[in-house]
């Protein structure tokens, strides 16, 4: 039974087609992966099915009495509430029922005895609903899911107003899982999770009995949890049975068959056109030429497979730094309180170091402290005199009205319009992307613009905070290649070991430094 049906949906922005005549169905219990390159329309599709965007054409039909949950990272968490209080909101309807029971008890003192039996029956019915839905063990349910996603490490009594972006995303995801909707819609849920919590979520989704739609560029994760793939490319949405690896096999085979059919047809067209050109003017053969022309006119032309432009990343190298890029002396990082013990660490020229560890332990804070953006809680950082650093920040400005072109041009005003456009195009951005505002670009397109700015700078030290978040498979592979090739020093925060394991020289685990219990 289809619980969500999308029929003949088309949508575009200006002259650019995002979806054309797209159809989609979601069956009960199906685990769907929605895949495609950055900017192909995955987020647009999610916005259409959740009612945030009206399609230009087509219809979206939900089955009656279906509950849905959408991981929207822009949802507001009210400061002043603890994490536990925010998570308890997932069960608000049960707390409303509990309040109804209390109100019934209060009214019993003011009604005739003849009405009390009916009211007691109502109380019993409500209590049965609450017991059936586990109301009286809610806190243990909350703690189970919260601990699985690492919120227990932060502390459930922590004010949500004090959380980092990654911690906030964890709260939203945990709340959504606790709601247990009939359709779960997840857009890049692993971006702010470390390895242990990704594995927990993977196991949770594998056992999830309801349906979900998942957007993720984390292929190992996707492979393990989905049984259907919908692929969006060149505005066309196509359904494949199986996981991502099976989709890739069928997709490549289909592409190969289409290319072979295209080449065969082109040869036939060439022969027909040659025959027509040689014979249409001769009286003896003009009828045969007309016959061939009719055949040509009726032919259904096979379109050549469009190859997506893949990004090319290359970082410009400045003169070499001294032996030590940085050294710390009794460094402690933190804000109101210390996040680590004393750190006496150093990074040597040419080293490529990945930093891992659960969220909230200070990975981003360490980078900012080393760069002088954040003051040390205690101790000091000694930087080399000949450093040319390039910093990729994890979270970009949300309401940036600059176009991608202006975003780069403002930083490099000496470049011509054509040079800026050319560099952005190398990063895999189209003309439409280049002239779009940063705040309307997808997460992956936004990341490519910021990587473009880094590529134009002479650097001998790259500091990258979760650069793979939002990047599609091709962009991620190309970034990995470029970082392998880079001759300078790299300090990388990343939650994907498969991205860095085969090229870094060392891995630092912040869990070994933290003052918190992990």
Task: List PLM regions with ranges.
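ABC ATP-binding cassette signature C-motif
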Residues: 1-258, 309, 318-518
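Post-kinase regulatory C-tail/linker adjacent to protein kinase catalytic domains
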Residues: 313-315
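Intracellular alpha-helical coupling/juxtamembrane segments of multi-pass membrane proteins
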Residues: 250-305
């Amino acid at each position: 039974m289809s619980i969500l049906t999308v029929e003949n949906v088309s949508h575009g922005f200006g002259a650019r087609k995002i979806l054309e005549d797209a159809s989609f169905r979601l069956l009960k219990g199906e685990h769907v992966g929605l895949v495609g390159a950055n900017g192909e329309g995955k987020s647009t599709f999610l916005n259409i099915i959740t009612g945030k965007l009206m399609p230009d054409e087509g219809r979206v039909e939900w089955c009656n009495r279906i509950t849905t949950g959408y991981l929207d990272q822009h949802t507001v968490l009210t400061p002043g509430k603890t994490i536990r209080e925010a998570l308890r909101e997932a069960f608000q309807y049960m707390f409303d029922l509990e309040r109804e029971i209390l109100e019934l008890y209060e009214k019993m003192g003011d009604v005739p005895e003849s009405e009390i039996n009916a009211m007691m029956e109502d109380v019993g019915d409500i209590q049965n609903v609450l017991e059936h839905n586990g109301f009286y063990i809610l806190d243990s349910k909350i703690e189970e899911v919260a601990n699985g996603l690492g919120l227990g490490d932060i502390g459930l009594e922590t004010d949500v107003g004090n959380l980092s972006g990654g911690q906030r995303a964890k709260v939203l995801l945990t709340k959504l899982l606790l709601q247990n909707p009939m359709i779960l819609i997840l857009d890049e849920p692993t971006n702010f999770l470390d390895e242990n919590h990704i594995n927990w979520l993977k196991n949770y989704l594998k056992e999830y009995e309801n349906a979900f739609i998942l957007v993720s560029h984390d292929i190992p994760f996707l492979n393990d949890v989905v049984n259907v793939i919908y692929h969006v490319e060149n505005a066309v949405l196509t359904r494949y049975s199986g996981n991502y690896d099976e989709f890739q096999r069928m997709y490549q085979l289909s592409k190969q068959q289409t290319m072979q059919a295209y080449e065969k047809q082109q040869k036939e067209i060439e022969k027909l056109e040659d025959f027509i050109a040689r014979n249409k003017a001769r009286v003896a053969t003009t009828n045969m030429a007309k016959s061939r022309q009719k055949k040509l006119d009726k032919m259904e032309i096979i379109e050549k497979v469009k190859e997506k432009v893949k990004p090319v990343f290359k970082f410009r190298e400045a003169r070499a730094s001294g032996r030590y890029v940085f050294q710390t002396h009794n460094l402690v990082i933190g804000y109101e309180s210390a996040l680590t013990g004393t750190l006496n660490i150093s990074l040597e020229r040419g080293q490529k170091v990945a930093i891992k560890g659960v969220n909230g332990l200070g990975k981003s804070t360490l980078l900012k402290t080393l760069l002088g953006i954040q003051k040390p809680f205690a101790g000091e950082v000694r930087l080399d005199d000949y450093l040319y650093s390039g910093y990729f920040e994890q979270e970009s400005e949300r309401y940036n009205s600059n176009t991608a072109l202006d975003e780069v041009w403002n930083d490099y005003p000496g470049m011509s319009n054509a040079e800026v456009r050319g560099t952005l195009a190398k990063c895999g951005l189209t003309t439409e992307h280049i002239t779009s505002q940063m705040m309307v670009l997808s997460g992956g397109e936004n990341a490519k613009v910021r990587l473009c700015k880094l590529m134009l700078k002479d650097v001998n030290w790259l500091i990258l905070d979760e650069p793979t978040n939002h990047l599609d498979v091709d962009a991620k592979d190309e970034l990995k290649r470029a970082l392998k090739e880079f001759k300078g020093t790299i300090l990388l925060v990343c939650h994907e070991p498969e991205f860095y394991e085969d090229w870094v020289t060392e891995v630092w685990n912040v869990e070994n430094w933290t003052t918190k219990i992990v």
